Every structure is written in C-alpha cells, then in structure tokens.
C-alpha cells in the first residue's frame, strides 16, 4: 500500500488485523518502554501511514510477531483504545491507566487537605486556635480598660455633711446627686406594679412628686411613688401600646402628652393629677410615634417624631394644634425617626435620630428644604459613615445645658458629641459594654450637671458610666432575664426609675451601706460583645424586620398571660395610615377622637 495521507477506512476487523503493526514493534515486554513515547500521541492525534503504520501503541503480546507483514489500512483515529477494556491484550489501556493515576493523586490531595489546619472565619488565617486565644486576650484587655480603678472621688460625704452643718454648703443635695459615691451605692428600693403588660414609658412630673407609667395594656397610671400607690389609672385612648407619656411643665400636673405605636399623639386633661376628664387626639403620624420632646417651660408646646420621618410641632392653644416642621430626608429618601430631643438652652433647636447613622440637628427658624434638606448640622462616628451593615439610632438626648448630645446606636455603642461643634465633627466620648439590639432603648444623662451616662441593656442590667472617663462605675440587675428599656432620673433627688419588658416599675436609691461590687460585670460585658460580634459577622437581616418580629412575639406572649385584658386593639388600616394631620376640623370627627376617661 502506497504512502498517502488521509486514508480513513472503516473500523478494522480486530480479529484478522493487528492494532500494533509498526516497524518499531519489538517482541516481548521489552518493547513497551521503547514505544511509550508514542502512546499519548496516538490517544490524542490520529496518525496515518503505509502498511497500517499506526503509531498508536507499543504494547505487545505473543501474537505480535506473527502479524508484522499484515497490510493494515486503518488509521489510529479509527480505533479508540479506551473502549477496548483491560483484558483484551493483557495490559491496561492508556485512558484507564491515566484515570487510576488521577484517582490516586486525588486521594493524596484529600489526605493533604485533611492534614491542613482549618481556616479561621474571623481573621482568614490558618491557625484558628491561636486566633481565638488572641481574641480572648484582646477582649480581656478591653474589659479591663473599661472597668479599671478610678481615682478617689473629690466629693467626700463626711466633709460635705460637716460643711452643711456649719452652713457653708448650701447646695448639698445638688452636689450629692452628682457624686460618684452615691451612684455607686444604688440599690433596688421597691417595685411599682399594676400594669398588665410591659411598661414602655415612665416620667416624673416637674416637682418629682408623681410618676406616670404606661405600656402594652394601653392604660396610664399616675403614681405616688414615695407611698408606692397609684393615684390615677385611666384609658389612654390609643389602639396599640403607648410608647411615651409625659407631664407638661408649669401646668399643675393637669396635662399629659402621649404617643404610641398606632401613630397617634394624644393629650390627657387631668384634674389635680387625680382624675382624668378626657383624652383627645391632636396629631397622627403614618407610622409609630416613638417620642415626644417637651418645651422646657411651656405648658402648651411640644414636638413629636415618627417613623414616617415627620416632625410635628404641637401648640395646644391653636384650633389646629399640629403643624409639620420638617420631613427628615437623606438624598431625597425619607428617614424614619425613633427619637427626638429639644435643646434646653435653645428651644428652637432639636435633634433627631432614626433609620440611619446620622444625628441631625435642626433650627426651626432656619429650615430650608433646598439647602441640605433643612439640616443645620449632622454628627456620626466616622467609622459608621460607610459601615457594612445598616445602623440605627434608638435614642438621642441633650445634656442639662444643651452643650452635649448623647446618641445610642442599635447593636453598637453610645457616643457623646459636642453639639456646638461644626457639621460632621467626630464624637468626644464612647461608652461600651451594654447591648442594644432587640428593642428601642433609651439612654440618658444622670446628675444635675449631666455627670453620668445611664443605659439599659438586652442582658437585663442597668449600666452607669462616668461621663468624663467613660468608665463603668455601676452595674445593676434591672430586669431579671429580660430587657431594660427606659430610665428616668428624678428631677432633683438621687433617685432613678427604670422599666422594661416585665410589668413593674423599679425605683433605685443610694441606700446601700457600701459601694456596689461589680460582681459578674466582666462576664456580662464579654458575653454582650461576643454576641454582638457574632451577629455582625452573620448579619443578614434589617433592624426593622427584627424589631417587628420581636414585638409581635412579645405581644403574643403577653396575650396569653393571666390578667391581660382585651382592649379591642386594632391595627390601623391603610386609609387611616394615610392620614398625617392634626385633629379633624368637623365637630363630628372631633368627638370621635375624644375619649372619656373612666378611672379604675
């Protein structure tokens, strides 16, 4: 047969023609090594030649010498050796040998992978155990720095008492309330309990003689907290839980402002704080209304904020009490609000916080929607400007003189800002150790000169920090196994009222014989930080969704408890939610918004 390229006959008869007819063929196993260089070439590229010179293999058997002169017109591309099977000629074919080698290599690689240390999900390194040790050590150092010993307090009890006896200290009570010595002696004095659900708001009147509380049961209770007795208990008129209830100043305790999860802003008219004449609606937000900000000396005016991003100013002397001040926006997008606080030194300025990381300060005289959405200045910790997960502010509050502003961040820390600094200024102090994740928690100043910072926590404790040093100086179990949300300092005595998810109001006084031992503080701080870091590492859900699920679960639990009354609470429908206005003009609708109080 002559040499010609491209001879492509049919599949050869494997019985009569030799697959290995080649000039280089050698008899015996010795030929295997000589032809090994041609094996892979035949398996991948078909080669043609005369006399069936198919350099597609060098494997020989005993019959190979008998077929050396056989004319074969088949080419290597006509035969696929991998389809032949291993037993046909007594030797494994190329494809199968390669597969076995690959399987052996894979098994070796798997063994090596099992021997390799597992990657640390936090740092990305290979030594996970060492990473955990380093993390624990760093955590211990951080906790020690937050609870380190403080220098001796400058205010001394015996010296102050002696000076008072001699008449040289006219401000003993004022100074005592701001003394670290008294704060470190706080202990639970007693419980006030008449509610049938969690208590979401507490507020002292201007003189400090009465305490108002309300919550899930939709009732407002006015307490003579010293005698531990309720003096007034009435229906609020809200459809869903009351979030805040506050006494107006300079009104003889005759007016109480309220807001709730149904978006309503209502006012209760009291008679000598012992009888409620009626409650009426004065404004309506399109979402929950979380907080009120009373004008310090006015018995008529206050501000409200809601999750509809609207701030209302309410003036009870007007026929239509509510007027819209501003709609909070960021890049033309509304920002729902959780909190509002009025500057006590400048009643035209107020601060708000909510669904993003910015504390916004407005001046009611200078709100220009075309310029920075009307914002006077904004503050936020610089590391939260471009954080990887959404951040929310649950509470903002001004200091006693309006020069400082506290902001508590959801699942973050508490930050102190200088309100007089320019727009975008960094925080001044940072307060750590608590946990603010499940509910909308309050933060507050404590002391006549705002010497301390106090906050509740998901762990059920009350934390006190010294404002100047950021050190934790007091740590109290405020709600066993539950959450502390509200903290209300007495206007002039060293007394603190707190409430949370249980049915009681707690009264704290500095009556402990010695300073409270911070027993278990390090373990609680460590647990709070680890849980927060774990949640941030596995962050998949928004704060609003978590809050909604939490409140629904909480209300369902309360509904099955003994003593829970059916108040006929209903969620507002879409048509009602579209209303964001003050009380209706018509007398008929006015009558519907007015609820006659029925004391219990």
Curated annotation (Swiss-Prot):
Q: Which SMART domains match?
A: WD40 (SM00320)
Give the protein name, as stated in the record.
Answer: DDB1- and CUL4-associated factor 8-like protein 1
> For the region Disordered, what residue ranges are annotated?
1-122, 562-600
Q: Which organism is it from?
A: Homo sapiens
Instruction: Say yes or no: keyword Repeat present.
Output: yes
Q: Where is the composition biased (Acidic residues)?
A: 74-83, 96-115
InterPro entries cross-referenced by the UniProt entry: DCAF8, WD40/YVTN_repeat-like_dom_sf, WD40_repeat_dom_sf, WD40_rpt
Its cellular-component GO annotations read:
Cul4-RING E3 ubiquitin ligase complex; cytoplasm
From the UniProt record, list the WD repeat ranges.
194-233, 237-278, 284-324, 332-372, 388-427, 435-475, 479-518
Q: Which family does it belong to?
A: Belongs to the WD repeat DCAF8 family.
The keyword Cytoplasm belongs to this UniProt entry's keyword annotation: no
